């Protein structure tokens, strides 16, 4: 068993989304003009904010699109009340995190909880949201079949591929550990 302890001044919690427009087979990504990087929207949790709310807010602030969490049929270690099988898919889908990533930069641990969301690629993008002004982002709806190749970071590619598989019904209902 690996253990680590991080006190409040040595970690930050962030949340992000893989946002799908299922009807049009598209995924919402961010293009950072100054570096040429493509990545998933994410950002820091505010004090007292729920993780799910952080994911939705940060996606809106960085992209200008209104989204909502999307229940998907995913295998999870989270338990259902009254169900001892912790390696099963949730009937009807779940909005639990699809992944968690961790990285340490300058001694600070960043933990990112990833959620699946739905959005409308034909919706009118809200302009002048907080992050757009400061970060020089473009929001791009990329075809599902092309997005993994477009994304810059390995973790974003892996998470997005898994979400697309789940959205297409290709994730097994259970697995063996």
Where are these regions (language model features)?
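Acidic, metal-coordinating catalytic segment for phosphate/diphosphate chemistry
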Residues: 1-22
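Eukaryotic N-terminal low-complexity, Ser/Thr- and Lys/Arg-rich leader segments
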Residues: 1-8, 168-177
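Short connector loops at helix/strand junctions that flank enzyme active sites
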Residues: 12, 33-35, 108-112
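Conserved beta-strand and immediately adjacent loop positions that scaffold enzyme active sites
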Residues: 16, 26, 138
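Conserved Nudix-box catalytic region and its N-terminal flanking loop in Nudix hydrolases
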Residues: 23-81, 177
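Active-site-adjacent beta-strand/loop module that shapes the phosphate/pyrophosphate-binding cleft
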Residues: 79-126
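NUDIX/MutT-family hydrolases
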Residues: 109-161
